[in-house]
Amino acid sequence: GTIGAIATARAAADGYTIMFTAHAPFAVAPFMQAGTTYDPSADFTPITKVAMIPMVLVTGAGSSFKTFAEMAAQAKAEPGKLDYASSGVGTPSHLNVEVIKLEQGLDIIPVPYKSTSQAMTDLIGGQVPLYMPSFPAALPQMKAGKIRGLAIGSAQRSKIMPDIPTVAEVLGKPGMTAVVWYGFLAPKGLPADVVARLDVEISKAAASPRIVAAIDKIG
């Protein structure tokens, strides 16, 4: 992420260097990683955003709470007793839960894991009661009945799992989302005509039936 962003920021703005990236090198790394040498708002030319992947707050199938409201009530009744898994400090699974904590006034404790798979294993096993991975990462285990969705970060409910309320619904915050965006950027100063051409071609590819079907399949 950050290595690619540094290389892109230093490259010539000739249309031959473009970066496909998630949000982290631009929305997180400059504020949490020492040695980040680029300015996310000044050193790049945005081309187009191609996808937004929602996060989903989940609990194990055997959890003592079945809904977001029940979880929040338990957390408020027992401050500091509940914890939640994250895929590491500064990851979406960490920062989005911290936002929920602030909005709800919850005192729940982050437990950073080295990987999504490790966090998911402990969630299923009951060692940790909460986790907020990406929806595609959680979907197979939700379909298998091993975990339960409490709130999804998309603007609307998922067509695949329509019973899971949105984060906006459970928090009473219309328009609020918890997503990871993916898009293409180029070095600062890329000519407008090149940006327009790349935007057209990338958007055309992203709208192809095969790509749309693949994205719909994972939520």
Description of each model-found segment:
Residues P30, K159-M161:
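Cytochrome P450 core scaffold surrounding the K-helix E-X-X-R motif
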Residues T2-A13, A75, E98-E103, S117-Q127, ...:
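Short helices/loops that flank or line small-molecule/ion binding pockets
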Residues T45, M71, K146-S158:
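Conserved helix-loop-beta element of the AMP-binding
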